[in-house]
């Protein structure tokens, strides 16, 4: 494919990606509201359309990215960079401007979201480190691994290559969360 950088077509692809992405979110929000309002069929149609918009956005995104979605390590790096921009630049600027215009409550929300974006960046960087050091499915000490498909529990330094209960691959294992 020809080089897109700097072309009107690149700008159009960016606009199409942004438009489809925003439409997907709006339709998802509206589906939730329709369901709460007692319109299950309308909610389902909003969700179906939201999924269509997601696929449209994916098509434009892939073209912007050279035809494919990159590997997980590259995606984690890009995600961390995006989150860094959001908390260090975008939301800081937005909070400052909201305050200057007298919208203190909105400024506080921007600042609150900036803190969340910082946590997102940190999480992505830790995950990237795990991928780069091949520490996603093995740890230095014993941990409790749980199959995300069937719930099987294994204690050890390494997740099994295959779940002995449901035969799903190692990719389905994670350290068992205890957030209850």
What are the residue ranges of the model-derived segments?
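Non-heme di-metal
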Residues: 1-180
């Amino acid at each position: 494919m020809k080089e897109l950088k700097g072309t009107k077509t690149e700008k159009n692809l960016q606009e199409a990606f942004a438009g489809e992405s925003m439409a997907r979110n709006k339709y998802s929000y509206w589906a939730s509201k329709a369901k709460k309002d007692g319109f299950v069929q309308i909610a389902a149609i909003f969700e179906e359309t939201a999924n269509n918009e997601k696929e449209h956005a994916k098509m434009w995104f892939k073209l912007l990215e050279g035809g494919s979605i990159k590997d997980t390590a590259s995606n984690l790096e890009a995600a961390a960079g995006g989150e860094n921009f959001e908390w260090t630049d975008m939301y800081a600027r937005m909070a400052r401007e909201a305050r200057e215009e007298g919208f203190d409550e909105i400024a506080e929300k921007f600042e609150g979201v900036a803190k969340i974006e910082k946590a997102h960046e940190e999480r992505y960087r830790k995950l990237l480190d795990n991928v780069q050091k091949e520490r996603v499915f093995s740890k230095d000490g014993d941990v409790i691994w749980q199959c995300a498909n069937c719930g099987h529990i294994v204690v050890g330094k390494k997740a099994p290559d295959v779940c002995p209960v449901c035969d799903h691959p190692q990719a389905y294992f994670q350290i068992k969360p205890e957030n209850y």
